[in-house]
Every structure is written in C-alpha cells, then in structure tokens.
C-alpha cells in the first residue's frame, strides 16, 4: 500500500486515543479488498474480499492501534494460510466496539500495491509525479531529514556513499 498525503498521519495521530482506527476509501471494485460496512458512520462488519457486495469502503492498510494490540494478537488463531491476519485483529476491536473508521479525503492518494500490475501502476504514478513536480515524493530519507531525525551532514554523507542515480541526485538537490 502506498499513501501520498501531507496531513493524514499528523492529524489522526494527534486525535487518536484508544482502540483501533482504520482508514478506508471508496472503490469501484470492492471484491478485491477487505471492506467495511458502516451504519450511520459506525462500523458493523468487516469482510475480506467479499463475494457479495456489502460496501464500497475498502480498508486501505493504514491502521493505528492502542497498546492492547500486542496482547490481542497473541490470542488470535492463524488463518488457513497459517498466518495471523490483520483483519482478524480489526474484527476483535470491532466486536469490542473499539474500532473507529476514517475515510481518506480527495487530497489523499492511496494505491494498492498487492499485485504486480498495481505495484507497477503505483511506481509509474510516483515517477510521473516526481518528474512533473521536480521533487521527491514519499522519500523516507527526506522525510527523516525534514522531521529532524537526520542532520544535513549525516544525510549528505549517506548520499555521498549511495549509488549515483537520479533518486540520490534529486535527494541532494532537495536539501542543498
């Protein structure tokens, strides 16, 4: 999953207190995703890749959990794939009436990257956006620098030792 937004995390983290919060977006093909059914904006059901229509609200894969999540995960049973499923954790919060839902707005972009085709589409979209804007989109190094987790000298040293390619050239031009 790939998200592009300037404000989604900062505003939601500030307001998040207890329980779990999941993010949704309306899609035209809900059978490809986990979806959530809402009644009066209250979550009532989560279904992974529903065969019959229940909702267009796809669960995007962006979640916030409180400190109870770890202990709740320890109680989950592995799925048929022998994995603990995030949907099952969300269902526990739903059952306990501790699940809240936020919808992504029109200024936020979500791209599924769960298939080869959707990953390629997402990569091409970001490449085109970077080319048009002339700046990096979604760079973890640049975000770390802008948030004060990396100093300019540390980032420049990192770039100096990195491969010489357009990504690192653009990263360097973003901070100099």
Model-assigned labels for residue ranges:
Residues 2-4, 8, 22-25, 36, ...:
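Weak global preference for isoleucine
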Residues 149-150, 155-176:
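Short, amphipathic C-terminal "tail helix"
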């Amino acid at each position: 999953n790939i998200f592009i937004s300037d404000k989604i995390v900062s505003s939601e983290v500030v307001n998040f207190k207890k329980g779990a919060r999941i993010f949704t977006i309306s899609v035209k093909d809900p059978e490809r995703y986990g979806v959530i059914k809402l009644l009066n904006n209250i979550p009532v059901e989560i279904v992974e890749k529903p065969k019959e229509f229940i909702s267009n609200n796809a669960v995007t894969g962006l979640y916030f959990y409180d400190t109870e999540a770890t202990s709740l995960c320890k109680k989950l049973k592995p799925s048929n794939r022998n994995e603990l499923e995030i949907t099952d954790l969300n269902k526990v919060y739903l059952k306990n009436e501790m699940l809240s839902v936020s919808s992504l707005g029109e200024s936020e972009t979500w791209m599924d990257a769960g298939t080869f085709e959707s990953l390629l589409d997402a990569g091409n979209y970001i490449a085109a956006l970077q080319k048009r804007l002339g700046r990096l989109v979604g760079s973890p190094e640049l975000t770390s620098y802008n948030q004060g987790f990396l100093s300019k000298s540390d980032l420049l040293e990192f770039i100096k030792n990195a491969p010489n390619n357009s990504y690192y050239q653009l990263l360097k031009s973003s901070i100099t």
